[in-house]
Amino acid sequence: MAHPKRRQSKTRTAKRRTHDKAVMPTLAKCPNCGAWHIYHTVCGDCGYYRGKLAIEKEVAV
């Protein structure tokens, strides 16, 4: 296997790792039920997406 000829500096290592952060997903409030869901996805509570029923959900009795 290949081995590095020179040690990488702390600055170069830090510059490479600048994009490796954890990002919080953007959330939106469902206008139908008021629950929070990720943008551009179906609401997990009611099954609606953009005002239309996308997934048939069973109502708990």
UniProtKB/Swiss-Prot annotation:
Keywords: Ribonucleoprotein, Ribosomal protein. Residues 1-20 are annotated as: Disordered. GO terms for biological process: translation. GO terms for molecular function: structural constituent of ribosome. Residues 1-19 have a biased composition (Basic residues). It comes from the Bacteria. InterPro entries: Ribosomal_bL32, Ribosomal_bL32_bact, Ribosomal_zn-bd. One of its GO terms (cellular component) is large ribosomal subunit. Belongs to the bacterial ribosomal protein bL32 family. This is Large ribosomal subunit protein bL32. It comes from Porphyromonas gingivalis (strain ATCC BAA-308 / W83). The lineage of its organism: Bacteria, Pseudomonadati, Bacteroidota, Bacteroidia, Bacteroidales. The gene is rpmF.
